[in-house]
Amino acid sequence: MSRVGKLPVAIPNGVTVTVTPDNVVTVKGPKGELVKAMSNKINIAVEDNSVVVTRDNDHKDVRALHGLTRALVNNMVTGVNEGYVKTLELIGVGYRAQLQGKKLVLSLGFSHPVEMEAVSGVEFEVEGGTKVKVKGIDKELVGAVAADIRKWRKPEPYKGKGIKYENEVIRRKEGKTGKK
């Protein structure tokens, strides 16, 4: 039995979960609604304020899908109830972020500013010009947008300049020692 898959997903107050016969899971909550089609090899049922994920056989691919499906449903329930936030920090001289409407404009040392349009389901928030918060109810989408922002200037190991996640630790390297 999957250690993750066998745990039921608790449904908090204000959240409703519906499952269609073809395994399309719909989760509605105070922050919005998420719909996701799951594999037909897995059984999903809503039983007394919790979602239970089970499997019919022990094939390797079905065992892998068991834990995955439970984790996806749990992420959907958490997303519509609390939401997800990824915080990015801009470290470097002249590295700045600002909002222009729903557009995020980054000054990252290029000859031009980098503009990123907010994808539907995701919103940006800028704190102090050097912190960018990516917020949304879909964990996968929030992570993907944050990774796209980070991709413009990954942190370098010598001075630590670049865009990094808030809790990310950058492994630093020693520079050249030079002649003496």
Curated annotation (Swiss-Prot):
InterPro entries, sorted: Ribosomal_uL6-like (IPR000702), Ribosomal_uL6-like_a/b-dom_sf (IPR036789), Ribosomal_uL6_a/b-dom (IPR020040), Ribosomal_uL6_bac-type (IPR019906), Ribosomal_uL6_CS (IPR002358)
Membrane-spanning parts: none
Keyword Ribosomal protein recorded: yes
Gene Ontology molecular functions: rRNA binding; structural constituent of ribosome
BP GO terms, sorted: cytoplasmic translation
This protein's UniProt keywords: Ribonucleoprotein, Ribosomal protein, RNA-binding, rRNA-binding
Domain of life: Bacteria
Any Gene Ontology CC annotation: cytosolic large ribosomal subunit
Protein's UniProt keywords contain rRNA-binding: yes
Family: Belongs to the universal ribosomal protein uL6 family.
Function field: This protein binds to the 23S rRNA, and is important in its secondary structure. It is located near the subunit interface in the base of the L7/L12 stalk, and near the tRNA binding site of the peptidyltransferase center.
Known partners and oligomeric status: Part of the 50S ribosomal subunit.
Name of the protein described by the UniProt record: Large ribosomal subunit protein uL6
Organism listed in the record: Clostridium botulinum (strain Hall / ATCC 3502 / NCTC 13319 / Type A)
